[in-house]
């Protein structure tokens, strides 16, 4: 344990605890050093909790109790599994202190010495970021594409793609207010969304029309580009050459770059706000109320939704009628099928009810048939007996004499069989009793051996548990060794760990040897006990036969019985002595454990703290009286 204490003290020094060089074991820890070590570890593990605790033990007893209770609560919040109170800090014992400091040392963060070996620079940081992102993505569960939500499909690029189908839209030119008014007042043209019958092609058509308007805006000031403008204002065809397309594509990209500029420029937002303000002002300071143009504009815009609604309603009227007829036919067919299904279900229910009643009747008929068969059999038996009796009635005296002879012969036969049974029963009974005695002896021997085997199993289990515990300690020490910083010299720790492992192996070999010796000794004891019992039984039987005839043999028999009794007492005394020696060893171990807990020193500290607490209370009472 001294090496484990040294490793633990080294960890506490790394956490910032000022452990004196002369302190080499936890037994030498004082109350002040215990409080400082726990507070330093708490500050490293959880700075929010440890920053509010003082690593110096206050002189006042009440403050000491409060600090000890705060430390106990902080350790319990970290998940300390054992019971913890102020006494573990003010009056510590070595085993409890070792468990507490081991618990805190396990939760100390390891040094990031591995980061020092990694390369620095932007490329290394970028590669580490890529690696962390890949690890995070690999940690997520994989979901098949068909089971993903639409949002996830759009984000991961697994959504179903729609082909780009555009249609030509007929819209007014924006450079003439008269043409716009005529277009909106025309009853022959539908709105832009309703001009495309397919829902998937509306967005594509609007984008295509917007691209053509953008091309016209770009090329209206360039001479000689009328062909390109005319090409951009219609749907692209296969016979157009690639060169104008590439030139127009470059012009669009250049125009977008010049017009939009850097992303998030505040000038565009300002221009948009000014434009909205000018439109709002223009709407507020518009034409006077009573002008003829205002009335005609209102009349036009009020009529336009009705005209468009009529146009939209006329187009799908025929399709709606066809759908209504189809639905009516389907509903009629469905209604007839439902009626047929209801009638079939009703017939099935009637048949099932008839089957249930017939089944009940069948069970009743079968029961009656079985009862009638039983009664018929009984009547046949009675009839057979009566017929035999009637046959014997004509010659009654002779038949009675014959019957008497048959009865007497049967009685003689029973007596003969009983005598034969007695002849066979006596030796069988003696053999049974002998076998029963042998079985009892075997059961006693087997129970004794079973008790011995259970004791051996218990000892083996205890040894295996001890070996398993030492293996766990070994693994824990190896893991702690791996978590130590790289700059610390590991040679001494490695050698000491190898020595500990060697000692554990030696102890394991010694335990195995002791167990084997115990087994052999137990076998020898059992064999000797069996020999002794058998020898005594044979001697007892031989001497007992001659003890009735000879007085000397009778005295020898008495001496033999006394010797056997004395040997039994001697064996029992030896077993009691061994039990007492084991209890003495257990008591010595308990005394050593109690000595390690420093009970006397803790009692002296408690008495001193009690006196100091009484003095503080007396001083406080004096202050209260003076006040």
UniProtKB/Swiss-Prot annotation:
Coiled-coil boundaries: 448-535
Q: Where is the PTM Phosphoserine found along the chain?
A: 410
Q: List UniProt keywords, sorted A-Z.
A: Coiled coil, Cytoplasm, Cytoskeleton, Endosome, Phosphoprotein, Protein transport, Transport, Ubl conjugation pathway
Where does the protein end up?
Endosome; Cytoplasm, Cytoskeleton, Microtubule organizing center, Centrosome
One Pfam family of this chain: CCDC22_CC
What's the protein here called?
Coiled-coil domain-containing protein 22
Cleaved signal peptide residues: none
Instruction: Identify the species of origin.
Output: Mus musculus (Mouse)
Quaternary organization: Component of the commander complex consisting of the CCC subcomplex and the retriever subcomplex. Component of the CCC (COMMD/CCDC22/CCDC93) subcomplex consisting of COMMD1, COMMD2, COMMD3, COMMD4, COMMD5, COMMD6, COMMD7, COMMD8, COMMD9, COMMD10, CCDC22 and CCDC93. Forms a coiled-coil heterodimer with CCDC22; this heterodimer interacts with the guanine nucleotide exchange factor DENND10; the interaction is direct. Interacts with CUL1, CUL2, CUL3, SKP1, BTRC. Interacts with SNX17 and SNX31. Interacts with CPNE1 and CPNE4.
